[in-house]
Swiss-Prot record:
Residues 1-28 are annotated as: Disordered. It comes from Phaeosphaeria nodorum (strain SN15 / ATCC MYA-4574 / FGSC 10173). Residues 1-13 have a biased composition (Polar residues). GO terms for cellular component: mediator complex. InterPro entries: Mediator_Med10. Keywords: Activator, Nucleus, Transcription, Transcription regulation. The keyword Zinc-finger does not apply. This is Mediator of RNA polymerase II transcription subunit 10. Component of the Mediator complex, a coactivator involved in the regulated transcription of nearly all RNA polymerase II-dependent genes. Mediator functions as a bridge to convey information from gene-specific regulatory proteins to the basal RNA polymerase II transcription machinery. Mediator is recruited to promoters by direct interactions with regulatory proteins and serves as a scaffold for the assembly of a functional preinitiation complex with RNA polymerase II and the general transcription factors. One of its GO terms (molecular function) is transcription coregulator activity. Its main location: nucleus.
Amino acid sequence: MSTEASTGETPEFQSYDHRGSPTQEAMKREIQSLIQNLVKLSRTAPAIHVLIPPEIVMYVEGSRNPDIYNREFVETVQRMNQMLKGRSEALQALQAQIAHQLQIAIPEMKDDIERAVEATGGKVPITGITLDP
């Protein structure tokens, strides 16, 4: 049940800083300016080609904030980078371990092993130093 029906009074509306005609004219100018800007925007939009990923469009259409999408995307990329960095470091350690073991097992191939490892960006451990398995 509404307040009007229960009290029998009509609701009151208050306006702050309304100065009659000058306020209406200012509001009219603002609305006209908004309409003109929207018309300009709709005319220039076809000439501007910006590729927006469909995921972001769907995110916005679902009334979600694209800044949150960006933050989640950056966090995902950081996690993946950390994971790949860990894998890369593990493979480098494996390469060094294999090179070290090959140098011990086949000492006459030491120079070839060093060249192969260095050609792939790795470093050969100094012979005589044992690496943890």
